[in-house]
A protein has these predicted regions:
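Bacterial N-terminal signal peptides that target proteins for export
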Residues: 1-11
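Hydrophobic helical h-region of N-terminal Sec-dependent signal peptides
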Residues: 9-21
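Residues in and immediately flanking transmembrane alpha helices
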Residues: 18-19, 61, 285
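Structured, acidic catalytic/metal-binding patches in enzyme active sites
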Residues: 24, 31-244
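A cross-kingdom marker for long, charged
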Residues: 238-296
Length: 296
């Protein structure tokens, strides 16, 4: 369920649903990476899962030490921007179909049947999404389904670290604006949006426990399994996969190499776990640049 899992965090704040129990895995040791900078300061990278069951067992000693040492915490985006009226208006403007266009009209009968069945699994009615574009419908299905499995959008690692950091007066930096993240989906051609929606619906129907598998892989530091679940599952929508993964990883790697490596600050970088797993991950790209990264 790589496509939808990776997309789920973008709309999580907008979802309201009743959660059922989820058997949370025992958190052993999520993967963590460290770069020793030439001046003696450090860069630590930790993968976030944007939707988690309740609990904070992921706060390992290594992560706590990195948090305490960090002069700056770096995250994908400032999550509080989702509450800004300009972002809300931008999302509303770009998530709705033009007048006279419905989701039914955009899908073939077979595609509609698949999407409707997935919406059933998520306790959603197809009619509730008729006015929305396929990309937004895909994310809504994913997040709602995850919440019904017991995952809480307010319990993500990134949100928890951001709340702690702001309470403790930590400095923050962000790789992207929320609008930049939304634009990844907004700028997809319509046919690619439909592919994204239908593939995600099929994944919910055929592999309903993928989110649980992802959290288990993350909780035990199984980077190879994270890559398999989150990144290799995106092959059905190559343009979206490139926009969500490789292109962004390359930009972040460049920023780390050109700026973070050269100043006197220690950094704690928190990004989605899928960005740190696989051949096109930030970790792999940093190593390709000759930067020594300690960790798996």
């Amino acid at each position: 369920m790589g496509l939808l899992k990776r997309a789920a965090g973008f709309a999580a704040a907008a979802v309201m649903a009743s959660a059922i129990a989820f058997a949370a895995p025992k958190i052993d040791e999520p993967a963590i990476w460290t770069i020793q900078k030439p001046n003696g300061t450090t860069i630590t990278l930790f993968g976030s899962v944007h939707l988690l069951p309740d609990g904070d067992g992921w706060r390992t000693k290594a992560l706590k030490d990195a948090y305490e040492a960090a002069d700056v915490i770096v995250m994908e985006t400032d999550l509080t921007e989702m509450g800004n009226s300009d972002v809300a208006n931008y999302l509303a403007k770009n998530s709705l179909n033009p007048p006279g266009v419905t989701l039914t009209k955009l899908l073939s009968p077979e595609q509609k049947a698949t999407v409707e069945a997935a919406m059933d699994k998520a306790a959603m009615s197809f009619s509730s999404m008729e006015g929305y574009k396929p990309w937004f419908s895909a994310i809504q299905i994913s997040v709602t389904y995850a919440v019904l499995q017991g995952f809480d959008p307010s319990q993500g690692v990134d949100k928890a670290i951001e709340a702690d950091g702001k309470s403790d007066g930590k400095a923050f930096a962000y790789f992207e604006k929320v609008r930049e993240q939304l634009d990844v989906f907004i700028e997809l051609p319509e046919d690619e949006q439909i592919t994204f929606l239908v593939l995600g619906a099929k994944e919910i129907l055929t592999r309903p426990d993928e989110m649980e598998k992802l959290v288990t892989a993350w909780a035990t530091g199984n980077v190879e399994e994270i890559d398999k679940l989150m990144n290799r599952g995106m092959e059905g929508s190559p343009r979206l996969a490139r926009a969500l993964l490789a292109d962004r990883n390359a930009r972040w790697t460049k920023e780390i190499g050109e700026f973070f490596m050269k100043d006197k600050n220690s950094y704690l970088i928190i990004v989605g776990a899928g960005h740190l797993a696989g051949d096109e991950s930030v970790i792999a790209m940093l190593r390709d640049e000759g930067i020594e990264v300690e960790g798996p």
